[in-house]
Regions:
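Short acidic, glycine/serine/threonine-rich loops at helix termini
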Residues: 68, 91, 111-116, 133-136, ...
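Hydrophobic residues within beta-strands of alpha/beta enzymes
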Residues: 78-79, 99, 122, 196, ...
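Charged (often Lys/Glu-rich) extended helix/loop segments that serve as interaction or gating elements
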Residues: 265, 271-273, 280-343, 362-448
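Glycine-biased, low-complexity coil/linker segments
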Residues: 352-357, 361
């Protein structure tokens, strides 16, 4: 479920007309719904009510401080993968004792910082990392709380770039080696064994891979509970969301279609609850995309329409530097017109355009939606049937709340877009748009 809907031919986020937000803050603009983020968090939290659990939001999905504050206030912990993410979470008011630190390449500085702040656990990805953390903690006269990330070698049925639980992936320690590594850890003076962690991938739309991984690791978890009195089992994140037809060009009931909607939160919990309940441990979850993916859109304006002998291109002001998912993964994002113009009056919309058939209700064209970046891979949609569009039209790239701005760059020396947050009938900036001066602010002339 999300809070984007059409009202009188205009797209709204909660109670805010998104066209007005675009006029106020410009485009490209990431616009997030606070209500959607909190609704998804509460649905998951309530579904797990009978289980001792902690939801640690995966900061990598969307690290905007306004989003982090929302989730902190709701009771979330945080899954962080860098010192920078820990810093962000703490600046948003997070409790370090509710933060877990993952990632295969933690640096000395990051480990020291996390120890100083008192994170709940380091998720250990290799024996080399275990030795390194023990060495650093010893030098600081501290004990580092750890959980091994165990790789169950389970096929997650997702994109190869976001599959993380197979034996050929770089993540975690093989299940068959884990017990021996735990035994080594138990003898290290600066290590405190706290739990077990797994994470098999992202954008997974079926329950079977999660259940298979849990059941595969469960015997090890039970053994470790007896031997080392571990506190928790973290099952990671990875539950997918709907990208295709995420608003179905105005349809209000896309989420009711089993064909277009992946696993629901309740279906996911119903599947994983039995094997987890039997373990009698605190369960950690690390959702990211699930909480914020459908809570955000990227607003962009059409600059030009270009036709060639083979193609019709709609060139927009957002580029692959703003949202790289289509170029990087071949990902699908629904793209819809913000205004369905039905009245010929120039007062019918903030843009002052009128006098044509409503976008989405008349003629359609097969088009490529592309950005201004100098790469053929700079596209948002290819051969997509879309309504008749023209220069100046405002479009919404749906389901852009996760892995959107956080993966943005200054490629082609393009300033980063702005971000804004909606709560009910209010919208406020949560990140200023970069200026061209910002592009060179940190550069210095070499002194030879």
């Amino acid at each position: 479920m999300h809070s984007f809907h059409y009202r009188d031919g205009r797209l709204f986020c909660e109670e805010v007309d998104v066209a007005i937000a675009a006029e106020k803050f410009g485009t490209p603009l990431y616009l997030y719904s606070a209500g959607t983020v909190l609704d998804h968090y509460r649905r998951l939290d309530e579904a797990l009510a009978g289980l001792d659990h902690l939801i640690c939001y995966a900061v990598k999905a969307n690290s905007n401080r306004a989003i982090l504050r929302l989730l902190r206030d709701a009771g979330a912990g945080f899954d962080i993968v860098s010192g920078g993410e820990l810093f962000r979470a703490l600046k948003a008011g997070a409790d370090a004792a509710k933060c877990t630190f993952a990632g295969v390449g933690k640096s000395c500085e990051e480990i020291e910082y996390a120890l100083e702040q008192g994170v709940y656990s380091f998720n250990i990805e290799s024996e080399a990392e275990l030795d390194y953390i023990n060495q650093i903690a010893s030098a600081k006269n501290q004990r580092a709380p750890i959980a091994l990330r165990v790789n169950p070698d389970v096929e997650a049925q997702t994109h190869q770039y976001i599959s993380t639980g197979k034996s050929e992936n770089k993540f975690g320690i093989a299940l068959e080696w884990a017990a021996k590594v735990y035994e080594r850890a138990s003898k290290m003076p600066a290590i405190s064994i706290r739990g077990v962690q797994m994470h098999i991938g992202s954008q997974i739309t079926e329950a079977a891979p999660f259940v298979a991984a849990i059941e595969k690791i469960a015997p090890l978890v039970s053994e470790l509970k007896i031997k080392y009195a571990i506190e928790f089992f973290s099952i990671g994140g990875g539950l997918g969301i709907a990208y295709e037809s995420s608003i179905a060009s105005g349809s209000g009931d896309w989420w009711k279609s089993q064909r277009s909607h992946p696993l629901t939160i309740q279906q996911y919990v119903d599947a994983i609850l039995p094997p987890l309940t039997r373990l009698g441990l605190r369960i950690l979850l690390e959702p990211g995309r699930l909480l914020v993916g459908n809570a955000g859109i990227l607003l962009t304006r059409v600059r030009y329409i270009k036709e060639t002998a083979q193609k019709k291109f709609v060139i927009i002001d957002a580029g692959m530097n703003d949202l790289i998912r289509p170029a990087l993964y071949g990902s699908y994002h629904e793209i819809v017109p913000v205004e369905k113009i039905t009245e010929p009056s120039p007062q019918s919309s903030p843009s002052g355009r009128g006098g044509r058939e409503a976008a989405g209700e008349g003629k359609t064209n097969k088009i490529d939606v592309v950005g201004p970046v100098c790469e053929s891979g700079d596209f948002f949609a290819q051969d997509r049937e879309m309504p008749e569009l023209r220069a100046g039209d405002l479009l919404a790239v749906m389901s852009a709340g996760a892995y959107g701005f956080v993966m943005a760059s200054n490629y082609n020396s393009r300033p980063l877009p702005a971000e804004a947050l909606v709560r009910g009938n209010k919208v406020a900036l949560s990140r200023k748009r970069q200026t061209i001066e910002d592009l060179i602010r940190d550069e210095v002339d070499p002194i030879w």
